[in-house]
Amino acid sequence: QIIKNTHKIQEKNGIEKSEVKEGGFSIPMTFPLEISEKSLKHGMNFSIEMETGTGKTYVYLRTIHELHQHYGWSKFIIVVPSVAIREGVLKNSAITREHFANLYNKPEMDYYVWDSKKTGQAREFATNDTLQIMVITIDSFAKAQNVMNKQSDYGRPLDFIKATHPVVILDEPQNMETDIRRNAIAGLNP
């Protein structure tokens, strides 16, 4: 179905259709997608590459709302490489909040930054049935000694998140290519 949907969008926008190949298919230019048993182990991976300042944050925030509205998906984690980028995402979210509320009939949602001093956030993320969007820096959960990975009275915060199989969005993924960071992202159980 993904291939059909991709072809439909490509055709509508005058983009050359992807070729279906053994083990996956190739989407030209900015949408590389490989489908194989190995690539599906941690879910499907889409790469959307856009020049700086062209609305990448808007695109993924709108995608979150579209996935929530059309498919009922409600658990989203935006992983960023630094506090500076996290702050930019938060600013963009604040600027577009009313816009998205109007476009999507004011969905009930929680949008917050992971705070290691508030470990209950992970449990709330997992148990709340409204749209949940958590912004987190990669360094907040990449190492075993991070609070996200430590046992508490209620369990490990990471275990609550893993149980939801969240949609994980990587902002600036080229800054998350080390094995430690890749394993940390896979550990979110997307």
What are these language model-derived features?
Residues 1-190:
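RecA-like P-loop NTPase motor core of helicase/translocase proteins
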